[in-house]
Amino acid sequence: MSNVRVSNGSPSLERMDARQAEYPKPSACRNLFGPVNHEELTRDLEKHCRDMEEASQRKWNFDFQNHKPLEGKYEWQEVEKGSLPEFYYRPPRPPKGACKVPAQESQDVSGNRQAVPLIGSQANTEDTHLVDQKTDTSDNQTGLAEQCPGIRKRPATDDSSPQNKRANRTEENVSDGSPNAGSVEQTPKKPGLRRRQT
């Protein structure tokens, strides 16, 4: 690299090293209008909120701060909760990305629903029926904020190997009198396509 020449237009390496050490290059993200005055910004925001509140009071003749009607062109009447449509008093829906865990079903960490067998008079001795395990809603909602595994559409598989779509034949089936005892696996054949003549 001794043959490399630095042109006169570019600064020498010594000058670049000195400049980087003393004065770092300003970042690409710059404040175009100077530093932010947070006190002035807070005052402007409070003034804007007051102006909006006063405009709403004049428009609807209602004091939204004290929840009382004012004199004006509208006549406010108090009504019973039962006479209103449900959407006026029901709690708001959670945001779309929020975690939903049903209260009736408990899930393990991988998202599989747990099931318990029925005990006592409800259970049959020949075949055991499985039901979803019911949990207390207060127990279930205490940890909603901390852990949100999400609900899986299908349960997680226990085995790590993917399922093979080919029809596997076990060795005991092969030795049961099949003509080709050497092959362990057989690919199923598609039936021939039937063409309709019109």
Swiss-Prot record:
Motif (Nuclear localization signal): 153-169
Keywords: Cell cycle, Cytoplasm, Endosome, Nucleus, Phosphoprotein, Protein kinase inhibitor, Ubl conjugation
GO-annotated molecular function: cyclin binding; cyclin-dependent protein serine/threonine kinase inhibitor activity; protein kinase binding; protein phosphatase binding; protein-containing complex binding; protein-folding chaperone binding
Top-rank lineage group of the source organism: Eukaryota
Function, as annotated: Important regulator of cell cycle progression. Inhibits the kinase activity of CDK2 bound to cyclin A, but has little inhibitory activity on CDK2 bound to SPDYA. Involved in G1 arrest. Potent inhibitor of cyclin E- and cyclin A-CDK2 complexes. Forms a complex with cyclin type D-CDK4 complexes and is involved in the assembly, stability, and modulation of CCND1-CDK4 complex activation. Acts either as an inhibitor or an activator of cyclin type D-CDK4 complexes depending on its phosphorylation state and/or stoichometry.
GO cellular component: centrosome; ciliary basal body; Cul4A-RING E3 ubiquitin ligase complex; cytoplasm; cytosol; endosome; nucleoplasm; nucleus
Subcellular location: Nucleus; Cytoplasm; Endosome
Swiss-Prot/TrEMBL domain comment: A peptide sequence containing only AA 28-79 retains substantial Kip1 cyclin A/CDK2 inhibitory activity.
Gene behind this protein: CDKN1B
Protein name: Cyclin-dependent kinase inhibitor 1B
Stated family: Belongs to the CDI family.
Polar residues: compositionally biased ranges: 1-11, 104-113, 175-186
Record PTM text: Phosphorylated; phosphorylation occurs on serine, threonine and tyrosine residues. Phosphorylation on Ser-10 is the major site of phosphorylation in resting cells, takes place at the G(0)-G(1) phase and leads to protein stability. Phosphorylation on other sites is greatly enhanced by mitogens, growth factors, cMYC and in certain cancer cell lines. The phosphorylated form found in the cytoplasm is inactivate. Phosphorylation on Thr-198 is required for interaction with 14-3-3 proteins. Phosphorylation on Thr-187, by CDK1 and CDK2 leads to protein ubiquitination and proteasomal degradation.
Keyword Cytoplasm: yes
